[in-house]
Amino acid sequence: MSANSDLFVQAIDPARLDVIYSSGGDGHGNRLRPFAATGQGEPLRCCLRYAEPGEQITLISYAPFDHPSVWTEVGPVYIHAARCDGYRPTGRLPGQLATGPRVLRTYRADDTMDYGHNTVVTDDADLGPIIQRLLGERDVATVHVRTLAPQCFLYAVAARLAVEADVEAGPIVR
C-alpha cells in the first residue's frame, strides 16, 4: 500500500445501528438513554468523529464481532442518540480519530487475533503509516483501532484492495 487512500475504514455497521435504534436497546440488555455530550472527548462510532457539546448521544454496549468468537469483547461505545448520516468511507482514516494514543489490534482473515503484530501507539503519531505497515504483514487482514487506556473499539481498517478483491466481502467487522 502506498497511501492512506488505500485504506477501507468501517464504523459500526449501519444495519446493526438500525436494529439498535429501532429496538431502543443495544442487544445486551441496555436501553438507549440519550444525554447531551460534553464535547470533552466522546468519540462517536456511528460517524467516526468527536461529539460536539450539546449533541444528543448515548452509550451502548458493542462487540465488533457479531458471530461466535473467543475474541468477542463487549464494551461501551458512544453513538448519536438518533440515526445520523453515518461515516462515508474516504479511503483515509477519519480525521479526528487518526492519531494516537491508540491500541491497534490485528486480526487474520478468519477473525482470530494476530498477537504478534498488536501495536500500542503512546504518542500523537499519525496512525495511517502504522496501520499500512500492519496491513502489509502477510497474516494481518484487519486492524481494530481502540482507545489506549480502556481499549474501547473505535473502528476497523482493512486494505481497500483486499476488500475490493473479495466480491463476497460483507462488512469487515462481522
Predicted regions and their residues:
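Compositionally biased, non-globular sequence tracts
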Residues: 1, 38, 43, 172-174
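Short Gly/Ser/Thr- and Asp/Glu-enriched loop/turn motifs at secondary-structure junctions
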Residues: 147-152
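Polar/acidic, low-complexity leader/linker segments enriched in S/T/G and N/D
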Residues: 1-7, 12
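Short intrinsically disordered coil segments
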Residues: 93-96, 119-122, 170-174
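C-terminal edge-of-domain segments
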Residues: 153-163, 168, 172
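Intrinsically disordered, low-complexity acidic/polar segments
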Residues: 68, 88, 113, 164-166
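N-terminal, charged amphipathic alpha-helical interaction modules
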Residues: 12-95, 99-103
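Short, hydrophobic/π-rich interface segment
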Residues: 105-142, 146, 159-161
